[in-house]
Amino acid sequence: LLKAIGGECAGALEISPRCEPTLNAVPPRYQPVTDEQLTQWSVGTPQAFSNVTGQGEVRLSLAGVQDKLPVYIDDDQIFIPVAGSPSTHILKFASSFYSHLPENEAFMALLAKSVGLPVVDVHMRATPKARIAVIQRYDRVLQDGVYGRIHQEDFCQALGISPSSKYEKEGGPSLKQCAELIRRRAAFPLLDLNKLLQWAIFNWLTGNADAHGKNLSFLYSQSGAPSLAPFYDLVCTRNYKNLSRVLAMQIGGTTDPDLIGSQHLEVMAADLKVRPKLVLDVAEALLEKIAGALEGVSAKYLELYGDSPILERIPLVIRRQLRRARSQWS
């Protein structure tokens, strides 16, 4: 498995057989992608793009529920990295199980950015038959005209927890463990603790029950000091009736988003070792910001990408969640 996918991993890790030279090409090499290929991949399966170079050199190494592909983009042209060359973006294709999932992620990224969360850049790209989410990689940086890798590790990796146990109820990271990890490791722990708090509350208020330990990462600077990476994989999972609404991480001792009230936020404050007033203030401020931003974000999405069923459904789901939160506080 590592031989097949190790050339272009998340972060700066590169894995190749001991007897072979490094896969990293100098200079990097890329193969252009045609519109026909993009259309084929957008409606196909992983097998549709598993050997796109014809030489077995393309290496898919990005985990998740969607079909996705690391690519290099230059002047809006998409290329496939060859022989371990760095990618710059990730393409996420439509899911056969969850309708309009790329659009969902693009909308939620716009919403998160509008209320002040640090979030990856996500935009939509259309093919004749589908829409694709294009996510800019935060672990790639342009240096002297060439893209290089910045190392990252998600919180399951940082805590030595198997990705198969990424949910707290299965032994995955809790918010308390994440906060303790930040205090031990982060270059600026107070700044990153505040980001963690906002991330957890935003996910609760916007109906994202899939905010688990692999959706938080450290990004390492050249000095080796880690900081919390921009947030990614923000999705309104409550938009899908067949998905569990149970939170991936407890908030104040409960995983039921409909029961969370001020008493749970006070327990959350104790878990994070911050003042209860800070947590309550952040929660109230985010609730008001999200409520006030939904209409503008919907208009912005419509302007950028055109109409989509998510523009009616997701704001409705989020407004219901905000009303439930208000009722618990009152």
Language model feature labels by segment:
Residues L1-S330:
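Phosphate/dinucleotide-binding and metal-coordinating scaffold of catalytic cores
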